[in-house]
């Protein structure tokens, strides 16, 4: 269970004051400087760590919500500097917190009693949110006939609230008119747990936006001018995306897989697509079907909207979504599969086309 690679904090070198020399961290730091990404170290740690915490939560809850399951085992929650450098911890090698999650937050999903909300993560606003409420209870004193206190918030507003002994709830979503992220809070006898649910409204696609899908079309717009979306067919030296990061170590199991992503979530391109700085499950299928390209070698100034966090054995500054101007053209390079038939893909396409067709671009 777990063992998701978190980008190593190479600045821990100064904490090694004994007999062990952190030659691995020293090599990684030199490689980062060589690839001109060392200044992004803190962002890389936070983004990859945020993803690792989300996945640990999902893994642990999957075990807890499985009937008659005998529990779970974690190899460790700290980094392991042996076996090719496995920086897989929520704690560093000195067993100190990386600041990714607090003790109380971790206990919400890995404690003696854990409220569970069994539901999908992605919905359309024409759907009804069907969820099962449950309680994993391994405490010394069992909670008989638990009362589930459920609150669903849309931003700061309460969207739905109930206190019930029933194990199932049905929540219509048709009052939601703009794609949004809902926060779910479930509390039982002082034990609390939280989740995020994404609801996508009917989307508007701007069909008059130019899509560049070939080198010939790209050369033409650069020469003659205009603005357009450049699709992944034009990405040179493509780097395949992935929501799930490298397992254990990219040295032990060679991989070009990234370790998360950093999103400019205040960018106007996301006016109609709910997101925060680091990806949640609304990005899973999108990232799994995406490609990026090495923006450090790109001609012209590049403004990344989404930047993937490379693994420390690769350190390529890659992006699946960025803006640039080349020649007379203003271009949005998009490595996502915009033809996908699922709500989050359609909504991303809608948000992107509306942005490109506006004076914001």
What residue spans do the PLM features occupy?
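Soluble or luminal CAZymes and related metallo-dependent hydrolases
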Residues: 48-55, 312-314, 344, 348
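Local beta-strand/beta-hairpin segments that build beta-sheet-rich folds
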Residues: 155-159, 166-168, 179-181, 192, ...
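Catalytic beta-strand/loop cores that center a nucleophilic Ser/Cys/Thr
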Residues: 234-239, 249-344
């Amino acid at each position: 269970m777990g063992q998701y690679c978190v980008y190593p904090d190479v600045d821990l070198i100064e904490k090694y004051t004994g007999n062990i020399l952190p030659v691995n961290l020293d090599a990684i730091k030199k490689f980062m400087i060589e690839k001109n990404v060392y200044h992004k170290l803190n962002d890389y740690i936070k983004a990859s760590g945020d993803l690792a915490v989300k996945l640990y939560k999902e893994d642990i809850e999957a075990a807890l919500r499985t009937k008659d399951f005998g529990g779970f085992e974690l190899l460790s929650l700290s980094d392991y500097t042996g076996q090719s450098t496995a920086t897989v911890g929520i704690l560093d090698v000195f067993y100190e917190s990386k600041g990714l999650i607090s003790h109380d937050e971790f206990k919400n999903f890995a404690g003696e009693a854990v409220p569970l909300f069994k539901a999908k993560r992605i919905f359309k606003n024409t759907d009804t949110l069907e969820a099962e409420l449950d309680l994993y209870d391994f405490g010394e004193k069992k909670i008989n006939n638990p009362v589930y206190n459920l609150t669903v918030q849309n931003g700061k507003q309460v969207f739905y609230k109930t206190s019930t002994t029933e194990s199932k709830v049905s929540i219509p979503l048709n009052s939601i008119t703009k794609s949004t992220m809902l926060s779910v809070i479930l509390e039982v006898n002082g034990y609390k747990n939280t989740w995020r649910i994404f609801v996508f409204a009917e989307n508007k696609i701007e069909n008059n936006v130019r899509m560049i899908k070939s080198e010939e079309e790209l050369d033409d717009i650069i020469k003659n001018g205009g603005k357009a979306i450049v699709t992944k067919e034009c990405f040179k030296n493509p780097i395949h995306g992935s929501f799930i990061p490298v397992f254990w170590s990219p040295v032990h199991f060679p991989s070009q897989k990234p370790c998360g992503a950093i999103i400019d979530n205040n960018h106007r391109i996301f006016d109609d697509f709910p997101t925060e700085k680091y990806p949640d499950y609304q990005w899973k299928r999108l990232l799994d079907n995406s490609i990026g390209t090495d923006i450090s070698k790109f001609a012209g100034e590049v403004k990344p909207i989404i930047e993937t966090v490379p693994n420390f054995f690769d350190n390529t500054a890659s992006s699946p979504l960025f803006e640039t101007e080349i020649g007379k053209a203003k271009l949005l390079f998009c490595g996502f599969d915009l033809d996908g038939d699922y709500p989050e893909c359609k909504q991303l396409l809608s948000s992107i086309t509306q942005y490109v067709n506006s004076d914001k671009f």
